Amino acid sequence: MRDPIETVMNLVPMVVEQTNRGERAYDIFSRLLKERIIFVNGPVEDGMSMLVCAQLLFLEAENPKKEINMYINSPGGVVTSGMAIYDTMQFIRPPVSTLCMGQAASMGSLLLTAGATGHRYALPNARIMVHQPSGGFQGQASDIERHAQDIIKMKRRLNEIYVKHTGRDYDTIERTLDRDHFMTAQEALEFGLIDKVVEARDVSADESK
């Protein structure tokens, strides 16, 4: 069975622009990158993480002061891959605005709440889900014990990140993340994961630019 993401990428439309040197064709995502828009779409894994981090670093080099917009629709995925994106978002100089369209689950929700304060959004029908990390291991008992200790440390670190970005106390975060916890956009706003639920673009802000 073919990878559905690969199938979709083969159908990515091209955008043709007229320049003083003639016509130039971009795939739609490259054209949006010119507008400082990055998509985090699908499972978070090493390949996606590499591409997102590279785009963040490129946009910082292009303009270290101008805001970057990250659109998220992700079920989550590998913790270390997500942490690479998170650390890069915090490392670069431009503020990163985040917006959830569809869903931001697991690591997707962490990336959503990691956006610049006041610039974390969700569309009205978006779904956000938070939970603790999970994993499965096999091998010697001593190795399994070490893996268990490591995942507990990772759980603690993820809780601390949610505390930092939501303003909630540690015990509340730990209780909330103990099981899969689903939220509507409005509930995510009330919890502190996002700053605003947006139904339409702010036309006045666009016109003032």
Swiss-Prot record:
GO terms for biological process: protein quality control for misfolded or incompletely synthesized proteins. It comes from the Bacteria. CDD domains: S14_ClpP_2. InterPro entries: ClpP (IPR001907), ClpP/crotonase-like_dom_sf (IPR029045), ClpP/TepA (IPR023562), ClpP_His_AS (IPR033135), ClpP_Ser_AS (IPR018215). GO terms for molecular function: ATP-dependent peptidase activity; ATPase binding; serine-type endopeptidase activity. PROSITE patterns: CLP_PROTEASE_HIS, CLP_PROTEASE_SER. Keywords: Cytoplasm, Hydrolase, Protease, Serine protease. It is an enzyme of class 3 (hydrolase). Pfam families: CLP_protease (PF00574). One of its GO terms (cellular component) is endopeptidase Clp complex. Its EC number is 3.4.21.92. It catalyses: Hydrolysis of proteins to small peptides in the presence of ATP and magnesium. alpha-casein is the usual test substrate. In the absence of ATP, only oligopeptides shorter than five residues are hydrolyzed (such as succinyl-Leu-Tyr-|-NHMec, and Leu-Tyr-Leu-|-Tyr-Trp, in which cleavage of the -Tyr-|-Leu- and -Tyr-|-Trp bonds also occurs). It is found in: Cytoplasm. The active site is at residues 106, 131. PANTHER family: ATP-DEPENDENT CLP PROTEASE PROTEOLYTIC SUBUNIT (PTHR10381:SF70). NCBIfam families: PRK00277.1, PRK12553.1. Fourteen ClpP subunits assemble into 2 heptameric rings which stack back to back to give a disk-like structure with a central cavity, resembling the structure of eukaryotic proteasomes. Cleaves peptides in various proteins in a process that requires ATP hydrolysis. Has a chymotrypsin-like activity. Plays a major role in the degradation of misfolded proteins. Belongs to the peptidase S14 family. This is ATP-dependent Clp protease proteolytic subunit.
